[in-house]
Amino acid sequence: MSNLVPMVVEQTSKGERSYDIFSRLLKDRIIMLSGEVNDVTANLVVAQLLFLESEDPDKDIHLYINSPGGSITSGMAIYDTMQYIKPDVSTICIGMAASMGAFLLSSGAKGKRFALPNAEIMIHQPLGGFQGQATDIDIHAKRILKIKDKLNQILSENTNQPLEKIKVDVERDYFMEASEAVEYGLIDKVIERK
């Protein structure tokens, strides 16, 4: 399977211009986060967020998410940038937002977190696998527990759920349909049409 990116041709008073589809969407302040959250995708999303802020710091940015999750540090780079920039970041789940994808979905501007009707959202605790000397494993175990506490605290703030409920719910994969994610507080509304 090839990774062809569609091109869009626009007619303007200055002539014809072609864009790849993602560049064209960026003109409308739309960023796509699809696939695994890793350093490459995080760098692209962060760069686009910063670019759009520089273009217009008062206009909302729309982050569409279809992601199974991925790296915590990469996801936190996106999260921190979403909080750092001036424009509100509206989040929209298309398909699935799981793990770090769900965390980012819930971290959009309050009142501007959405999912399409058949989207699926899943939260769980951080995953980690380490090997090496016992002392190194102990260091990594303490670190992942610290990260787990931080993520739980932010999820509690994002959802208005008690921290104790979050701790229980993330112990295992917790799947929700879009309407259930509204009740839980991960998103604000299920949208069917623009």
UniProtKB/Swiss-Prot annotation:
GO terms for molecular function: ATP-dependent peptidase activity; ATPase binding; serine-type endopeptidase activity. The active site is at residues 99, 124. GO terms for cellular component: cytoplasm; endopeptidase Clp complex. Its EC number is 3.4.21.92. One of its GO terms (biological process) is protein quality control for misfolded or incompletely synthesized proteins. It is found in: Cytoplasm. It catalyses: Hydrolysis of proteins to small peptides in the presence of ATP and magnesium. alpha-casein is the usual test substrate. In the absence of ATP, only oligopeptides shorter than five residues are hydrolyzed (such as succinyl-Leu-Tyr-|-NHMec, and Leu-Tyr-Leu-|-Tyr-Trp, in which cleavage of the -Tyr-|-Leu- and -Tyr-|-Trp bonds also occurs). Its main location: cytoplasm. It comes from the Bacteria. Keywords: Cytoplasm, Hydrolase, Protease, Serine protease. Cleaves peptides in various proteins in a process that requires ATP hydrolysis. Has a chymotrypsin-like activity. Plays a major role in the degradation of misfolded proteins. NCBIfam families: clpP, PRK00277.1, PRK12553.1. Belongs to the peptidase S14 family. Fourteen ClpP subunits assemble into 2 heptameric rings which stack back to back to give a disk-like structure with a central cavity, resembling the structure of eukaryotic proteasomes. This is ATP-dependent Clp protease proteolytic subunit.
